[in-house]
Structures are given as structure tokens and as C-alpha cells.
């Protein structure tokens, strides 16, 4: 009924404001569902509101907040109206039908989610899900007013929604708009890390372990890949918000998926003064992007670009095409750090092209044991422009993901 991550990304809201919008939508939807239940066309307003709201929210325009309110309220109204019907929970036969309906619905949901995520958040499958939801509400819509024993659920849900809205409003008023930041020193530590949305090598989910791995290197800048802002398949948590708050670092978001909930991110203790996003035009499986930020340091500014190139072993041509787009996106800005999972080993044409463009591989002097992926390859890189001095590079021996983080200590050119 409401995804705080989607509300933050599509409408540009902070978490408390996102929770406020969704809470008001839920409360309004429950009230609307109670009023419409029993009318033969009562499903129509909820259908129109949810459909129009999804369209507005998906566009991410200035109408996104209104879209979130409408979609949440419309969906909640349809659910409330159906659940208030006399056909729900009346006798053993009715219970069996409801249980079967829920079971089939869950199976259908899993199938749709699988297709949705393999298409990297395609709106097509969201539309299919909306059609199925509204069709089900139309078929199951109650034909008469709910009985008196059904009504108490209405004020309870309404009060709960209002309380959520009030709590979110209070949090919005008392929380700072941004975390504190200061110019970085002339010597900094940079990390690149594919966090697999917080899942460790043994598939155990723990963002706390992810945070501890990052803390072990005490980095000034962290470039992250496979960051989820609320995908259900990745536990529904907003990885970026949680890690930013937990580590006390500024966050920049670079979505790759169409819905804006999965992609790359950059955390920094410095002040971010510019941010740019590039979406690659070619991809073989999941959509990919690159994120660039300009971070202020004591004697100048540093550009940091994070990316995650295509994964399949047979996608070499696609990765080369993505590298050409990446180099055009970089456009020679210096000094620069380009970091991320490139899905190419040293000596691959992808790495050769980046070195040919003048970049330096900070891990070039590492031994063959310095692998970064679970299958024993070095495919995660920290590349720098030649005016940056590489003081140290290492791979942390920690498996809080299916990748190990790469860390480098760098001296900025103005420190010479």
C-alpha cells in the first residue's frame, strides 16, 4: 500500500514526509472504502484514484506527491471495501475460499515480482499488477452495506493512520535536513563495495554487518553498488538511508532501475557540491547507470564516479559500449576517482580501454590472491587520474556481501 523508498525517490521527500503522505493516504483510503462499500459501483472511485495516482507517482513530476496520495488511498479503499463485504469470513466455505484466494494471490505476486525485478523495475508489470488488483476488487466488491459488526475496523484503521501521520510530522520537524559535512583532508581513504543489498555470502541479511565492514576501513568516501531503496526482494529496506544514518555520512543516489529503487550510491564525509546521473543506453540483463559527485577537499575539489557494468560473462561487447559511454560521461574532469564493479578482470578489453584513457588502476600491484568476487576474480576497481598519488591499496578480507571491498589511500595533487 505504500513504499517509503519510492516516495522519497519519486517525489524527492525526506523519510518523515514520505511516511506522512503514505499515512494520510492509508487513513483516507480506509475511510473512503467504508463509505463506498455496498454501492454497486463503489469500486470505481478507488480504481480511478489508484490508476491515476500510480501514473502520476511513476512520472516523478511535481505531481508525484498527489500521485502517491491518490494511489495509496485508492488501493486502501479497494482493499477496505472488499474486506468489509459479507462474503468475507462467513462460514467455513467462505473462509476456505478466502484462504485459497490469498494463496493464489501470493503465488501470482511472486511471479509478477520476479518478472518486475528481472526487468529492473519496468512499469509494464506494475500496470499488469494494477489491472489484476482492480479486476479482483470488481469481482469481490460487496453488493450491500456491511453489517454493524464490520464497522469497528473503520475508526480503528483511521485512528492508526492519523497517528502515523502525526508521528511522521513530529519527526520531520525535529530531524535535521542534512548531516553535517566539512571539506575532506588532502589525504583520503576511498572504498568501493558491492553490498548485494545487505545480503552476506551465506545469504544472511544484515545491514549492520555491511556498516561494520565499511567502518573497518574508516573511509572518507564509499562507492556502493547493488543498493536497494525498498525492493521487496531485497527485504524492503532503504539501504541508502539506513547506511547514511548509521555511518553519519552524506549520501548521493544514482538509480539504475526504472522505478528508481535500485542502483549505485556514494557516501562521503565531505560536502557534495554537484551531482550528475548517466543511464547506459545498452544492457544485456539489468539496467545500469553511473553516478558522479563533486566533493570539496581542503585545496580543491574531487570528482567521484561510481558505476556497475553489465554482468553476464558473454556481455563483453555490451560492457565495452558502456565503458565508452562512461568515458564520455567522465569527460576528462580531474582529479577523478572512477570506482565500482566492472565485471572484467585485469587484462580484459574493458580495463585496457580505461587505462588507455589515462586512468590508473590502484590495485595493479596487488597479488593474485587479491580477488574481490566469490568466484575468485578481481572485478571491482578503484581507478584514479594520474595526478592523484596512490599511497596504498588493499582488499578487505570480509564477506558481508558476495564481494569484498577494495580500499585505497590517496593523496590529492594540491598536497604536493
How would you name each of these model-derived features?
Residues 286, 315, 415-416:
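C-terminal luminal/periplasmic domains and tails of membrane-associated envelope-modifying transferases
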Residues 9-15, 197-199, 277-281, 308-315:
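Surface-exposed cleft-lining segments at the edges of enzyme active sites
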Residues 147-150, 158-208, 212, 216, ...:
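N-terminal signal-anchor transmembrane helix
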Residues 1-175, 294, 333, 344-416:
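Metal-dependent phosphoester-hydrolase catalytic domains
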Residues 188-195, 206-236, 254, 267, ...:
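Active-site beta-strand/loop signature of hydrolases that rely on acidic residues for catalysis
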Residues 199-200, 229-233, 259-261, 312-314, ...:
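Active-site environment of divalent metal-dependent phosphoester hydrolases
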Residues 121-123, 170-182, 202, 221, ...:
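Structured beta-strand-rich core segments of catalytic domains in phosphoester-bond hydrolases
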Amino acid at each position: 500500500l505504500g513504499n517509503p523508498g519510492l516516495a522519497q525517490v519519486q517525489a524527492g521527500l525526506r523519510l518523515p514526509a514520505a511516511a506522512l503522505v503514505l499515512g494520510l493516504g492509508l487513513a483516507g483510503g480506509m475511510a473512503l472504502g467504508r463509505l463506498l462499500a455496498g454501492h454497486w459501483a463503489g469500486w470505481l472511485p478507488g480504481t480511478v484514484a489508484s490508476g491515476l495516482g500510480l501514473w502520476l507517482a511513476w512520472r516523478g513530476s511535481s505531481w508525484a506527491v498527489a500521485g502517491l496520495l491518490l494511489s495509496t488511498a485508492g488501493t486502501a479503499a479497494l482493499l477496505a471495501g472488499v474486506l468489509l463485504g459479507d462474503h468475507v469470513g462467513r462460514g467455513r466455505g467462505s473462509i476456505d475460499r478466502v484462504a485459497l484466494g490469498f494463496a493464489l494471490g501470493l503465488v501470482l505476486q511472486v511471479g509478477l515480482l520476479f518478472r518486475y525485478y528481472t526487468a529492473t523495475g519496468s512499469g509494464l508489470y506494475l500496470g499488469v499488477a494494477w489491472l489484476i488488483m482492480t479486476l479482483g476488487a470488481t469481482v469481490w466488491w460487496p453488493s450491500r452495506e456491511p453489517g454493524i459488526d464490520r464497522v469497528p475496523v473503520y475508526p480503528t484503521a483511521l485512528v492508526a493512520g492519523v497517528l502515523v501521520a502525526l508521528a511522521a510530522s513530529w519527526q520531520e520537524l525535529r530531524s535535521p535536513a542534512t548531516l553535517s559535512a566539512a571539506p575532506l583532508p588532502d589525504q583520503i581513504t576511498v572504498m568501493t563495495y558491492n553490498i548485494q543489498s545487505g545480503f552476506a555470502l551465506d545469504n544472511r541479511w544484515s545491514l549492520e554487518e555491511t556498516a561494520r565492514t565499511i567502518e573497518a576501513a574508516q573511509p572518507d568516501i564509499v562507492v556502493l553498488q547493488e543498493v536497494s531503496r525498498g525492493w521487496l526482494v531485497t527485504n524492503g529496506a532503504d539501504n541508502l538511508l539506513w547506511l547514511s544514518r548509521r555511518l553519519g555520512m552524506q549520501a548521493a543516489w544514482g538509480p539504475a532501475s526504472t522505478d528508481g529503487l535500485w542502483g549505485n550510491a556514494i557516501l562521503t564525509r565531505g560536502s557534495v557540491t554537484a551531482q550528475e546521473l548517466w543511464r547506459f543506453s545498452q544492457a544485456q540483463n539489468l539496467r545500469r547507470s553511473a553516478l558522479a559527485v563533486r566533493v570539496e577537499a581542503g585545496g580543491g575539489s574531487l570528482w567521484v564516479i561510481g558505476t556497475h557494468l553489465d554482468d553476464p560473462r558473454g556481455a563483453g561487447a555490451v560492457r565495452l559500449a558502456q565503458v565508452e559511454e562512461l568515458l564520455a560521461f567522465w569527460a576528462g574532469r580531474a582529479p577523478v576517482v572512477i570506482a565500482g564493479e566492472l565485471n572484467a578482470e585485469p587484462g580484459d578489453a574493458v580495463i585496457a580501454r580505461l587505462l588507455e584513457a589515462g586512468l590508473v588502476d590502484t590495485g595493479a600491484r596487488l597479488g593474485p590472491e587479491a580477488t574481490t568476487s566469490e568466484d575468485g576474480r578481481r572485478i571491482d576497481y578503484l581507478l584514479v587520474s594520474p595526478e592523484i598519488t596512490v599511497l596504498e591499496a588493499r582488499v578487505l578480507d570480509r564477506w558481508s556481501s558476495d564481494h569484498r571491498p577494495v580500499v585505497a589511500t590517496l593523496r590529492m595533487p594540491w598536497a604536493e
